[in-house]
Design a protein with these regions (language model features):
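Long, Pro/Ser/Thr-rich low-complexity/intrinsically disordered regulatory tracts in eukaryotic proteins
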Residues: 2-304, 309-310, 317, 329-361, ...
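Short glycine-/aliphatic-rich beta-strand segments at the starts of folded cytosolic domains
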Residues: 319-325
């Protein structure tokens, strides 16, 4: 009764002529939910939740049904869903006593925004750095600010390496990109590196060409590393991949491997200062060249330089020094010392995929995880020392985190840490105590 009597008091919404006219246009401008474009035959999140038993990655430790449910129906504009993000950790679950990996890869830059609940926790767990909206990741390429990196005790330091990864805007990351995207990235990189060669002479090698002409070019080429195969980054190998090498052997630039671009400088004399300087200078040059082509490197104010692996966001920088340690490696306080120094120490292992021989027989070597440039020797004889370098007592010491510090600060941590570790090793050789050398938390 009340409804019939009072209905006249309820006025219908007022419709303005212009609103009626432009409503279809306005509605067409509303971004469409990317997930609505898919017709995936999936069950409920509970039924689709992955089996994480015996998964020893950070993804396996952090992911639960509640978080999985929140991410389940989300997709980025390029079609990355949450199952794509965690698939690397499901394919490679890690080992119980092995190094802890993140167990996930971003498919594109938007992944870090759309799946921020998950990625922020991964970053905090791996780097010990809490991501906040008001935090700003700083960057510093002033290599002159690095102190003491030009000299290490050569009786202990065998070599050093500095590498930096970058992702190019408007392209999906390697784990998700299409063949066409990868080839476009290759063409873009070739244009940039041709211009870079005007300042630092170098040669551009397509991995596909190297595989076909290995006998003529004296190149030893193996299959891609197992880590790239498991994560799906090695799809369509070797299509769209390339290597640029400077003629003086100071710099290697990888295209479309783990990242869109990776610069590596290796020094067999242990001069970390020069390796860091080489990467900084050429990284800034390539950044300018990519900007001119309207494809800048991806930067987020709270994450810094964004790449596919959350283990490398921030600076994308890895600084490593190969050292000989026979005593400290067996010390029970080693893990605590490394934690205090914010460093990681791993036994060396040969991960050799490409071997280029020097035509002019100059004594030089460049190692970047995939490539070694060595003197012109018989292939078996030349490779044997590198295949044997996983011997006990030889370790790589590198920065543990890549975010929360700028490039100079991270490299300085490695310089200071390695020098302190060498002092401890000398003490232990003389059977003396190292307790007074144990540092406070950096």
């Amino acid at each position: 009764m009340w409804k019939r009597e009072k209905m006249w008091m309820i006025k219908p919404p007022t419709e303005h002529p212009k609103e009626c006219k432009y409503r279809p246009v306005l509605e067409s401008l509303v971004p469409r939910d990317p997930m609505s474009r898919f017709s995936l035959k999936r069950s409920s999140p509970k039924e689709e939740f992955p089996n994480l038993d015996r998964n020893y990655t950070l993804m396996g430790a952090i992911l639960d049904l509640h978080m999985y449910t929140r991410q389940f129906n989300r997709a980025t504009e390029s079609g990355v869903i949450f199952d794509d993000i965690i698939r690397p950790g499901l394919e490679d679950p890690g080992l119980l006593n092995g190094p802890k990996s993140v167990g996930c890869l971003a498919g594109d830059a938007q992944s870090y925004i759309l799946f921020c609940d998950f990625f922020d926790r991964i970053i905090e767990s791996y780097h010990g750095y809490r991501v906040t909206s008001d935090a700003v990741q700083e960057s510093d390429f002033n290599y002159d600010n690095l102190k003491g990196g030009d000299y290490f005790d050569e009786d202990y330091v065998l070599s050093c390496e500095v590498s930096a990864g970058r992702a190019v805007d408007d392209f999906c990351f390697p784990v998700h990109c299409s063949r066409g995207e990868r080839r476009n990235l290759l063409a873009l990189a070739q244009t940039v590196l041709e211009q870079l060669s005007e300042d630092l002479p170098g040669t551009f090698h397509s991995i596909e060409e190297l595989s076909c002409e290995s006998e003529e070019r004296r190149v030893v080429m193996d299959s891609p590393p197992s880590s790239l195969i498991k994560t799906g980054v090695a799809r369509d190998w070797p299509d769209g991949r390339a290597l640029w090498l400077s003629k003086d052997g100071s710099l290697a630039i990888w295209v479309n491997m783990e990242e869109h671009l990776k610069l590596v400088s290796f020094r067999s004399d242990g001069n970390l200062q020069e390796a860091f300087k080489c990467v900084c200078i050429n990284l800034m040059k390539t950044e300018i060249l990519y900007k001119k082509l309207r494809h800048p490197f991806i930067w987020k104010h709270h994450l810094g330089w964004v790449v596919s692996s959350p283990a490398e966001v921030g600076t994308g920088l890895k600084t490593s020094v190969t050292v000989k340690l026979l005593h400290l490696a067996e010390n029970k306080r080693l893990k605590d010392i490394l934690d205090r120094l914010r460093l990681r120490m791993e036994e060396t292992a040969c991960d050799l995929s490409v071997c280029l021989y020097d035509d002019d027989r100059r004594k030089r070597a460049l190692v970047s995880g995939y490539v070694t440039v060595i003197p012109n020797l018989n292939a078996t004889e030349a490779l044997q020392p590198w295949l044997d370098r996983g011997c006990p007592g030889i370790y790589n010491i590198s920065n543990l985190q890549t975010i929360g510090f700028n490039e100079v600060e991270l490299t300085q941590l490695v310089v200071d840490g390695v020098k302190l570790i060498i002092r401890m090793e000398k003490r232990l050789e003389n059977k003396s105590s190292i307790e007074d050398l144990v540092p406070t938390k950096k």
